Curated annotation (Swiss-Prot):
Record family assignment: Belongs to the SIS family. GmhA subfamily.
Originating organism: Histophilus somni (strain 2336) (Haemophilus somnus)
Signal sequence, renumbered to the chain: none
Protein name: Phosphoheptose isomerase
UniProt keywords, alphabetically: Carbohydrate metabolism, Cytoplasm, Isomerase, Metal-binding, Zinc
């Protein structure tokens, strides 16, 4: 009944991934982002992550794998997804939804920390505001974007962009792969100081 559609979806996902992998710069940027976060951890910094919708779920998944466990038994790492419901509802009500992430960065972020901002369009106003707040605090910024990078293009210290223009879910599929690789590389890098 839907077998051909299933195959078409899987082949399209594979095509987007292959195009992303074929750009060697993407591979280098993933490594650069992982080292940026690891360097922050080594200096007693932390990573904050944020996004909307599916990207919010990715931001939470990223943080929980770092504080919890990914593939290796190791110490937890200082990662916080900006996802506290009481904070989000308070700031949304009092200041507006476009400030939910930036207010948290202003309150908790410190020089030497890292912000991971995730937006498939690169145009999420609340993530853009968080980037601005992070830069004002002397934090490093990593952005996971899609399409042409939107308004986030050029704002981050490291931008990992999935140049796909059809559906956001295809971009999110690459983002979650990137997130898993970041965590793996962070584990590798942090293991060096435990040896």
């Amino acid at each position: 009944m839907y077998l051909e559609q299933v195959k078409t979806e899987l082949f399209e996902a594979q095509d987007v991934l292959n195009k992303f992998i074929s750009n060697e710069q993407n591979i280098k940027l993933i490594q650069q982002a992982a080292l940026l976060i690891s360097d922050s951890f080594k200096q007693h910094g932390k990573v904050l992550s944020c996004g909307n919708g599916g990207s919010h779920c990715d931001a939470m998944h990223f943080a929980e794998e770092l504080t919890g466990r990914y593939r290796e038994n190791r110490p937890g790492y200082p990662a916080i997804a900006i996802s506290d419901v009481s904070h989000l509802s308070c700031v949304s009500n009092d200041f507006g939804y476009e400030h939910v992430f930036s207010r948290y960065v202003e309150a908790v972020g410190q020089k030497g920390d890292v912000l991971l901002g995730i937006s498939t369009s690169g145009n999420s106003k609340n993530v853009l505001n968080a980037i601005e707040a992070a830069k004002a605090k002397g934090m490093k910024v990593i952005a996971l974007t899609g399409k042409d990078g939107g308004k986030m293009a050029g704002l981050a210290d490291v931008e990992i962009r999935v140049p796909h223009f059809r559906f956001a879910d295809r971009i999110q599929e690459i983002h979650i792969k990137v997130i898993h690789i970041l965590i793996m590389l962070i584990e590798f890098e942090m293991a060096k100081i435990r040896q």
